């Protein structure tokens, strides 16, 4: 079940640490909301939360978006903030590609292979959803779910699916502005 979202504010956060996950118990990130508004939120879907930023993010670190056909099993990296050090790259493995259309957000099974991330978090924890997954220099998707009984593993959504929702939202916004 996805909670409907009428609208909201995107604000900066400060991640201060986490509660480590274990088999049968999902961990979670710890942090605080800051008073800096960075945009608006307008849609919550199985593929993620969507909205608009107040300022364009620097394109110095932009990476191309892979189509679902370009995603393959094997090594990749996620970018996640799990402590006060900010965004860091961590090693993961794409275990399986789920090419059926029955789920818009459970397109890949991923496994955390980075020993430092496993030591800090126990694997995937609440708050890591949305962490980008990079493979061969391309954005292939984002973390969506943890397997509660195996927190080293979880699901991820194809970036391709996320992009389709984003494009539809942008088209809707343009129509609203035109009328």
Task: Write out the residue ranges for each language-model feature.
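C-terminal recognition in membrane/secretory proteostasis and scaffolding
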Residues: 1-179
């Amino acid at each position: 079940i996805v909670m409907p979202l009428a609208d909201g504010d995107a604000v900066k956060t400060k991640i201060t640490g986490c509660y480590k996950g274990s088999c049968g118990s999902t961990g979670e990130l710890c942090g605080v909301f800051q008073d800096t508004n960075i945009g608006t939120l307008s849609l919550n879907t199985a593929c993620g939360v969507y909205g608009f930023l107040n300022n364009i993010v620097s394109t110095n670190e932009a990476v191309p978006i892979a189509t679902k056909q370009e995603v393959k099993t094997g090594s990749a990296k996620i970018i996640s903030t799990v402590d006060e050090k900010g965004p860091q790259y961590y090693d993961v493995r794409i275990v399986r590609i789920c090419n059926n259309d029955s789920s818009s957000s459970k397109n890949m099974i991923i496994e955390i292979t980075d020993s430092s991330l496993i030591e800090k978090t126990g694997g995937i924890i609440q708050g890591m959803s949305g962490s980008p997954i990079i493979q061969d220099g391309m954005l292939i998707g984002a973390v969506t779910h943890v397997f509660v009984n195996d927190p080293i593993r979880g699901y991820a959504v194809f970036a391709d699916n996320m992009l389709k929702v984003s494009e539809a939202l942008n088209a809707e916004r343009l129509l609203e502005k035109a009328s």
